Amino acid sequence: MASMPKPNQSARGRVTVVLGSQWGDEGKGKLTDMLAGEMDICARCAGGNNAGHTIVANSGPDNVKTKFDFHLLPSGLVNPKCIGFIGSGVVMHVPSFFSELDTIEKKGLKCDNRLFVSDRTHLVFDFHQVVDGLKEVELGGSSIGTTKKGIGPAYSSKASRSGLRVHHLYDFDTFAAKFRKLVEGRFKRYGNFEYDTEGEIARYRAFAERLRPFVVDGVTFIHSMLSSNRRVLVEGANALMLDLDYGTYPFVTSSSTGIGGVCTGLGIPPQCIGGVIGVMKAYTSRVGAGPFPTELNDEIMTHLQEVGAEYGTTTGRRRRCGWLDLVMMRYSCLINGYTCLNLTKLDVLDNLPEIKVATTYMLGDKELSSFPADLNILAKVDVQYKTFKGWRGPISNCTSYEQLPDTCREYIEFIENFLGVHIEWIGVGPGREAMVHRPLPPHEM
């Protein structure tokens, strides 16, 4: 095992982070795919297989365009020279890890000796998934609409200090004893639901040996990479408004999905982070229950759903859609400190006669000065909008900012000025190449 590296000032700024800025499904995977070609490592820092995205990339000996679905593995693996790393802040369902790995390798994407898992990563078991479903049933009309992947119950085990981590697999008798105790606790809470405890233990004995070559001391691994001047791309899961602390609680996920979760999930200090790219749709969507101030229920909503293909990669559920919410985005920018933004799915707005963005929340005759923590207040706000003329034509063939219609650029620049953050990347179509890059002029950097 490599010795623990000393703190290295040369690691300063070598990490680039891609984060969702809304309620997820912003299109982080596309930008991650593009940036991964310039990176040495692509890392996951939080969440589990409860989120997902699809990437189309050339693969195999014939270099054929192939579709890859990523849920748990870092999507930067589509770059055959990029190392994938699952950090300590992730919760990992081992069967899903191997299922996803086997699927992408069958499609020609080989991951031998370039995929690693922190030994501190917590494990998601099948009983966590059963409990997830039972809890949703128990909540009834108050359910939050989880993916039922066991993520919340696994993080609950972690927070209550009863969870099991990857390293526990390599003291298997202790693992088995702790596992039985963990399941017994769930039986006491939810009754004797159908579950084969001993069968699961037997499966994990086999999983432990198959997983062994992937397991590393996560802290030593990531800092050794940074000390070797490797460039790291961090692929955020979910998005800021699903963050356990700063999202629309309790309609959130169970992990830290913002910039703080990057440091705690990978074991790196803040000074290692050189850039934070916030990914935002040109409109807003969310899956499951929870408040949504700009939600639409008309033909515009249908347009956004159909043209934007707003169906969840993980659940297949139709996403709720509405106008871009700049009040929420300003809150997101404050917390995550984006150095630039990637505006995605702008082409979905192509044929709309007019386009709106939310600029103000009013409560009675009072303007709210911040995004409210209290969801009862959020449910009562009146949203004020700025309306733009639509550009009424396709933009998918635009390859430079100057080629975009004037009204389209007006929309982009209003968002940019409102948020005070430069929009560097603009998605103008579903294809990998349909991205306009708009770097800041050197004198403005």
Swiss-Prot record:
SMART domains, alphabetized: Adenylsucc_synt (SM00788)
Region forming the signal peptide: none
Residues the record lists as binding substrate: T313, T314, T315, G316, R317, R318, R319
Keyword list, A-Z: Cytoplasm, GTP-binding, Ligase, Magnesium, Metal-binding, Nucleotide-binding, Purine biosynthesis
Metabolic or biological pathway: Purine metabolism; AMP biosynthesis via de novo pathway; AMP from IMP: step 1/2
Record localization: Cytoplasm
GO terms for cellular component: cytoplasm
Pfam families: Adenylsucc_synt
UniProt keyword Cytoplasm present: yes
Ion transport found in the keyword field: no
Binding site for GTP: 24-30, 52-54, 319, 345-347, 427-429
Origin superkingdom: Eukaryota
Primary location class: cytoplasm
Family assignment from sequence similarity: Belongs to the adenylosuccinate synthetase family.
Complexes and interactors: Homodimer.
Record protein name field: Adenylosuccinate synthetase
Organism: Malassezia globosa (strain ATCC MYA-4612 / CBS 7966) (Dandruff-associated fungus)
Lineage, uppermost ranks: Eukaryota, Fungi, Dikarya, Basidiomycota, Ustilaginomycotina
